[in-house]
């Protein structure tokens, strides 16, 4: 199953670099679209004192799990939507989803997601996609569009307001500009670039979702725009 394999690879990438913006988007896309291997009926096991529902992005990991868990062998394992399983476990007041549970071996795709945190994560990145790629934003004037804006955000101790510095780029004349993006393709090129995106990611930069007016006149906090041309 190529889709499940792609889901597995994305999960591994996310667990290696959980702050990676594009990997997070890809993971949410898989959670919404790619079925996982899960028990047909609600089935939970205890891990670290918490009741979790095991799901798998690897057939091999499922077989290994069944080999070590007698109760798992009694279940009928099928392809199911992660979101359906998540809804079910929330209703049953269980802790969360456990991906690719195993006792030893390659654990680079093994993790527990608390349901509350996972729902928040899915909602945030779904909203990001809707803000950026929704029909309303596509049709909006450039001054009204929502852009992806790379920035460094520091909270001031005295009043809790945000100070924001932007990941500026310079032209041959030495003039600085704030990079903003309306589509994921151009953003991905910048984000993956060794000169721009890599240092930004290492410095734990934040991706804001803003119209241009927020850059020049923010509704909260302060933006550092000295010597920036545009």
For each of these PLM feature ranges, what is it?
Residues 1-230:
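An interfacial alpha-helical scaffold signature
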